[in-house]
Amino acid sequence: MIGISGDSNQSLKAYGVNYEQIDLIDNEFDEESIVERLQQKNVKLVEIQRSRGYSQRLSLTIDKIESIIHKIREVNQEVIIMVDNCYGELVETKEPGDIGADIVVGSLMKNLGGGIAPTGGYVAGKKDLVYEVAQRLTAPGIGKDLGANFNLNNAFFKGVFMAPNAVKNALKTAIFTSYMLETVSYTHLRAHETP
């Protein structure tokens, strides 16, 4: 956790990590503000959240993410670009790692775990960055070699195997439900019009 005040000596804020959020404007990246921050501040990492989370915005398409990654690279070649890909796995033909993201993170309890994995997450991307994340998430010297625990490998493997079909069926159901709700004048979930 970043931490609000830095009072905890274990928060990221206590380690000197600062955070600044640039909100979307009408579901589009605020390119002007992003470029301005990248030019004015010592930015080490840009994080992009693909899913809508609990907000009412649309999830970001891979094309929108690719476009902003190119814009970020025009301004700063060295910044690390991380995409939180929760709920974004397997919904389009490309993934964030295919379009220039340095590191991609997500949950195994959602799309990639096929709804079967009871816990867990994943980190994928450039080898040196995955190594750094593994060292921080577990323990220095153990890193990625710790692996899954609690006898959950069976659920993880089943989840990853079932994920493509589970995601496909979830998308079909969401599109169908959205269309049906719109026919009764409930227009808040217009997924059937989303690419």
Placement of each model-derived feature along the sequence:
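Conserved PLP-enzyme active-site core in the AAT-like
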Residues: 1-168, 172, 178-181
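Single conserved hydrophobic/aromatic residue that forms the stacking wall/gate
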Residues: 188-195
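Hydrophobic alpha-helical bundle architecture
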Residues: 184-186
